[in-house]
Amino acid sequence: MANAWNPDLYSKQHAFVWEAAGDLLGLLNPQPGERILDVGCGTGQLTARIAEAGAQVTGVDSSASMLEPARRDFPQISWLLADARKLHFPDPFDAVFSNAALHWIPEARQVAESVAGALRGGGRFVAEFGGHGNVETIVQAAIVAGARQGVNLQ
């Protein structure tokens, strides 16, 4: 697992990642008692906001150094060092959430299968991964998928 992240530098230079996530959290709309998995939780700021809504949230990240401040600052939350390509849980989650993390993992198919396996039937996946180059890939995939359904998205 990668461990090249610096939590101090991340907090100083990339706080916008969690500060601008209000709309994404609104889409997630966490409810009291829901089981929610936060994939690529980093230092845990958004995971904590999900927990504040009353959800039972588990934060996972592949970087032990990023999880250190999460565990220190939010000890009431369950934190796991895990690879997003290989998520295995005994019970499914009501929702999987991810903000600004998945674009760092080149094995998108493995991540998608892993996320799908973590969700209960009818569960929801709410994510933002608009890193450099991703948006064009997503647009092209949507155009192809639309064309297969007879919908012109160009």
Q: Where do the protein language model's features map onto the residues?
A:
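Short alpha-helical
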Residues: 19, 45, 65, 103-106, ...
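Conserved class I S-adenosyl-L-methionine
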Residues: 1-34, 45-49, 66-69, 73, 124-151
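Class I SAM-dependent methyltransferase SAM/SAH-binding core
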Residues: 35-39, 43-87
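A short SAM/SAH-binding and catalytic strip from SAM-dependent methyltransferases
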Residues: 95-108
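A short glycine-rich, Lys/Arg-flanked "PGG" loop and its adjoining helix->strand segment in the class I
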Residues: 109-124
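A short acidic, Gly/Pro-enriched loop at the edge of an enzyme's catalytic core
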Residues: 85-96
